[in-house]
Regions:
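Hydrophobic ligand-binding cavity/cleft-lining segments
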Residues: 1-38
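Intrinsic-disorder/low-complexity, polar/charged segments enriched in Ser/Thr/Lys/Arg/Asp/Glu/Gln
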Residues: 4-10, 48, 61, 74, ...
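Residues at helix-coil transition
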Residues: 25-26, 71, 141-142
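Surface loops and adjacent helix of pleckstrin homology
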Residues: 35, 54, 80, 112
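Hydrophobic-ligand binding "helix-grip"
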Residues: 39-42, 59-104, 114
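A conserved amphipathic terminal alpha-helix motif
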Residues: 108, 114-144
């Protein structure tokens, strides 16, 4: 699948980066905004991360490895979804990068997903990530 197309999404959240970070790394909060995913990880560099659930009527168990952690600033991991229909080999993994930036007490949360095989695939992924970030924003802002 190796591709050069980048998917991206961003949202400004009315909360400090520390609260947004908690939402990115707390399995209970992740379940609330990530389509009901059950997440297993300690979110330490080199650790495995697994996402299990159901999306659009299909069960999935996605997985990857945490590549880089800068608390309250950056979370980067690999990601593979068997629902892609691709073989589970490194060249079919995406790298997902969350970047948090303090903007006057709020947080600009940006997400990028690399290795999309086409412009259409990148656009579809961007739309899904945008939906997820909007849900994350609602979870964080409602937990004041």
């Amino acid at each position: 699948m190796t591709g050069t197309f980048l998917a991206s999404a961003a949202v400004t959240i009315d909360a400090p980066p520390s609260r947004v970070w908690n939402a990115l790394t707390d399995p209970a909060q992740i379940r609330e905004y990530m389509f009901g995913s059950e997440v297993t990880s300690d979110f330490a560099e080199g650790s495995e991360v697994r996402y299990a659930g159901e999306f659009e009527g299909k069960k999935y168990e996605d997985h990857g490895v945490i590549l880089e952690v800068k608390e309250n600033e950056l979370l980067r991991s690999t990601h593979f979804s068997p629902l892609s229909g691709q073989p589970d080999v490194p060249e079919n993994y995406h790298t997902i990068t969350y970047t948090l930036r303090d903007v006057g007490g709020s947080t600009l949360l940006s997400l990028e997903q690399d290795n999309n095989g086409s412009e259409e695939e990148a656009a579809h992924s961007s739309a899904n990530w945008s939906q997820m970030l909007t849900a994350l924003k609602a979870v964080v802002e409602s937990s004041h």
